[in-house]
């Protein structure tokens, strides 16, 4: 399957026109939303980008890793390369499929 996961920093539910926003038109995102799956009841585990991405990729709460906080662009990896992550699980699932 083709999966496109878009993670946008500081994007709220009402910021895209496909969800009813009228201040800014977002035709590209609207098209993707209309041709794919739209989620209308989601939540995030953290209010900051690094912590949210950490949780999404690992399935863990960000507070389980004290390094999952706002970090500069040159920061060291905060996810151990041996740790199970969403991309690894998806890749393994495709191999078994």
Describe the residue ranges of each PLM region.
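Formylglycine-dependent sulfatase
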Residues: 1-97
């Amino acid at each position: 399957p083709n999966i496109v996961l878009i993670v946008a920093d500081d994007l709220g539910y009402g910021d895209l026109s496909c969800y009813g926003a009228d201040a800014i038109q977002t035709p590209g995102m609207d098209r993707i939303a209309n041709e794919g799956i739209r989620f209308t009841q989601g939540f995030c585990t953290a209010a900051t980008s690094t912590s949210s991405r950490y949780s999404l990729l690992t399935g863990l709460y960000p507070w389980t890793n004290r390094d999952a906080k706002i970090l500069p662009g040159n920061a060291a990896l905060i996810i151990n390369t041996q740790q199970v992550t969403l991309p690894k699980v998806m890749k393994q699932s495709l191999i078994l499929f």
